[in-house]
Regions:
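Acyl-donor-binding surface of acyltransferase catalytic domains
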Residues: 67-78, 86, 110-201, 213, ...
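Conserved beta-strand-loop-alpha-helix junction that forms the acyl-donor binding cleft
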Residues: 132-139, 242, 271-281, 298-302
Length: 302
């Protein structure tokens, strides 16, 4: 509620997902991913808005839209703009949050831009990576070629896949009813995730995003993470105890997360899978995720 020109109350609406209500402040995540804070004292009324009917066909998306959605799902601790490039750092936790996202022109000659990049990461005692996408309209094949010509090496490649969310939520996965959903990763979740040298840093990084959910099966048999951002639900960190593989647990985790994302109004899904992970690729094939584009992390020459 705000004061109008005449001094009388003027009412405004905010539509989104209530992601927290703490110390008298409501945090609402809008469909575009923007977060809005509302003082409890200014709240006049609230109601549940039914989710739009879920789309059953595969979603359409541009490379830039997906790149920005993915970036919001793995947010850095610090970032700096260089023209249309974003330099990101997070103390080395994940390449995605510790690489340049080059969505356009850096605004200066490429050699000067790369010099700025390597210097920026060196000051943080981090290797310099540039995330380059290929295989879709608007991707960066030319930039990749220029980096290779300058001695940068592609170390890791991953597919970005997309699909309709509703079929993931509808999949027959009895263990989905056992999945525990939380807003923060607990010790059991982090223990199964395994890629953690600094638990405090991991927790700080993993909870960042528009609307983040963590899924855990009892005993840490399987885990997953999902970030709901407008129409998109992004799946990550789907990990299964090796002793319980081929039991449908990864599917169960994804089904439980998908159902929660559908409740929040999402209709489309995305995920990233490294190209040398045939087991995960087979899982996502079965859930009808299709490749949208591929990205590569190029590392600066030593």
């Amino acid at each position: 509620m705000e004061a109008g020109l005449s001094g009388s109350p003027e009412f405004t609406d905010t539509v989104g997902v209530l992601t927290s209500w703490d110390q008298g402040v409501l945090l609402i995540t809008k469909k575009d991913g923007q977060s809005v804070r509302i003082s409890e004292s200014s709240l006049v009324a609230g109601k549940i808005v039914p989710a739009a009917p879920a789309r059953r066909r595969g979603p359409a998306a541009s490379f830039e839209e997906l790149s920005r959605v993915a970036a919001r799902a793995w947010q850095p601790l610090e970032s700096e703009r260089l023209g249309d490039w974003t330099l990101r750092a997070a103390a080395g936790f994940t390449r995605r949050a510790n690489s340049v996202l080059p969505l356009g022109d850096p605004g200066i000659p490429l050699d000067d831009a790369l010099a700025r990049v390597t210097s920026w990461y060196a000051r943080r005692s981090l290797p310099a990576y540039v995330q380059v996408a290929t295989g879709a309209a608007g991707t960066q094949e030319m930039l990749g070629a220029e980096l290779e010509r300058r001695g940068w090496a592609s170390e890791v490649s991953a597919e970005v896949r997309i699909g309709s969310l509703a079929p993931v939520g509808d999949v027959d996965a009895p263990a989905a009813d056992e999945v525990r959903l939380t807003r923060v990763p607990d010790e059991e979740w982090l223990g199964r995730y395994g890629r953690v040298s600094d638990p405090d840093l991991a927790r700080r990084m993993l909870v960042e995003g528009p609307s983040v959910w963590f899924a855990t099966l009892p005993g840490g048999r399987a885990i997953g993470r999902c970030v709901v951002d407008g129409r998109w639900a992004g799946f990550a960190a789907v990990t299964v105890d090796p002793a319980h593989r081929r039991e449908g647990l990864a599917t169960a985790v994804m089904a439980a997360l998908a159902r929660r994302a559908l409740e929040e109004g999402a209709s489309a899904a995305w995920l990233q899978v490294e190209t040398d992970n045939p087991g995960a690729s087979a899982l996502y094939d079965g859930l009808r995720f299709a490749r949208h584009h591929t990205y590569h992390h190029y590392r600066a020459a030593s």
